[in-house]
Every structure is written in structure tokens, then in C-alpha cells.
Amino acid sequence: MELAHATPRTLTEGDRALYTALYGSRFALQSGDGFAKHLGFRQSPIDDLLVFHTVFGKSVPDISLNAVANLGYAEGRFLKPAYPGEMLSASSEVIGLKENSNKETGVVYVRTHGRNAAGEQVLSYVRWVMVRKRDAGARVGETVVPKLAACVSPADLAPPHGTDYATLFDTTLSGSPHRWDDYSTGEKIDHVDGMTVEEAEHMLATRLYKNTARVHFNQYTEGKGRFGRRLIYGGHVISLARALSFNGLANAVSITAINGGRHVNPLFAGDTVFAWSEVLDKAEIPHRKDVGALRLRLVATKNRICTDFPDKDDSGKYPADVILDFDYWALRPRKL
């Protein structure tokens, strides 16, 4: 079953400026045209997560408007840069369905595709979401749970053609001298800074993505619900944590794949977000000597600094102040 989502969205320089104002991202590739052109891009591309949130937002009315929770992500691939002035559209195919034991909710698995006006894929990812059944007594068909890769293979990563991340990469302008070669598997990085979430900012951000899920907007209904207040969109947390990761990962200039991710606890306005990262793996990219990939685990907390790298325990249970566990591949320049 495939769903074509309304409506297309042209991303502009204004959208990019607003995204920067919301999160304070400082990565050089998405900040400066001259810097990007030196690497072979035609201009500074739209931030990868702004593309992700825009495509995600297109799917909400058809997939998760009244969702209980967005549960996770897998097999995300950024396939082509998006530039200001380009129009994006989205479609999704249902690839799995599982009824929960309470018979009142179930989990839907979808693969969503984002395309530009030429029909070229710029993004593809899987997510699964818990939704309520319209009729709790209705019979559900056969359970189908898709087999998803634990991570995107380095062979499937897609640095843009015609780019050179190493030769003219200016580490003074980028804010860090450290390249792919300087990181070690198992290394942990505290990103130090914190950022407090405001009610108006997260609603503005969610509207920017045309994400209409009522849990983020409607205090009248959410005030009567489980938490008694509006829930911060999980993507807002991802973008905040990614922006904070500039401290220590300034040259991780592109997200090239999303391996997985979980929103493990809720976030509300007034909470302060901190983050830390762990290097899970390093990979060379076939036929590219200028750029390598780091597999990074980005963990975000609320109201807790990360000097001790707060994490799940041996049983897999997370502390109440850990809110995000996000696994992704990032591109970094290599040493020549």
C-alpha cells in the first residue's frame, strides 16, 4: 500500500534562516556558500535534518496524525543534496503491521521517500509508529514485521558526486582541525553546552515542517491526556542535539544515513537539552579517498549535564532524564 502525501514544499533561504535561528547550527557546509563551493557543491545545501523534518512532516496527516508515539527509525539514506529553491514531495509505503496485545493500538511500519521536482530521491527512511485502532474490536490481518538492517552499509552511503571533502577543506573556517583519521572507535564526546526548549519555539518549528500531529499543538486536548501538556516533537530534539554536537564534531558536516533512533522519554517546554556522542565505528567509503564516515551514537538528556555520559543500564533501561538515542553515519574529510 503506497500513499502519496500532500502538499509539496519548496524550501527557501528563509526556511534555512529560520531553521538556524531555532537550533543555532554552526556546521560550515550548511552555513557558507563559498565554503560549500570549495568542496564542489553548487552552493550551500539545505541542512540534512531540515530536509528530513520536511519530508517527515508531509507523512504525518496520513500516517501519524493521531499517533500515540513515534517509536523508531531505520535504513535512512540521504541520497542527493537539496538546495534552496527546490521543491520536495513525499510518499510512503506500508511495509509492516502489528496489533498490540491490548487490542486497542498497533504498530505501523512505513518506508517514506522524499523526492525533488525532477523525481529524484533525496531521502528514504523507515519509521514505525504506534496508532490507535478505529474499532478496538476489529479483526486485524496477518502480522508483518519487516526485517530491517541494524545499520546502513558503508557501501550504500552516498557522498555527492563531484565533491572533494579533503583538498580545499578549510579547518579554520570549519572550526576544528580534526578529520576522520583523528577519531577512534569507542571514543566518547561531551558536547558541553545546553539549550532550553521554549513552548513557542517548538510549535514554530513543528509548523515549519507542516507537522500537524495534535500532541504538539493542542493544549485543550493534551491537557486532558497522559502528560497534561503538549509534547515536544521528537525531531526538535534531534536537531537540538545535532546542533550541540558541533562542540567536538564540527567537521561532521553531513549526515549521510540514519541507522536507528529512539525517543526514549518525553521532553517538555522549560526543559534544557544536553548531549553526548560515542564513535561506534569508522568506515572508508568505496572509491573515495577524500571523505570517510563515522558511525555516531548521539544521546540527548534533559536537565542533566553529560560529563558522566548518562546511558541505559545493563538491562537496557534508560534513566528518566535520557530522551534520545540516535544512531547515524556522518561524513568527515580525511587527511590527504
Language-model regions: role of each:
Residues M1, A82-H161, A269, W276-L336:
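HotDog/MaoC-like acyl-thioester-processing domains
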Residues F227, H263, E284-I285:
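Generic recognition of flexible, low-complexity loop/linker segments
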Residues T7-T10, Y83, A205, P266-F268, ...:
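Amphipathic alpha-helical hairpins
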Residues M1-L71, L123, K133-I258, D314-D325, ...:
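Hot-dog-fold acyl-thioester-processing enzymes
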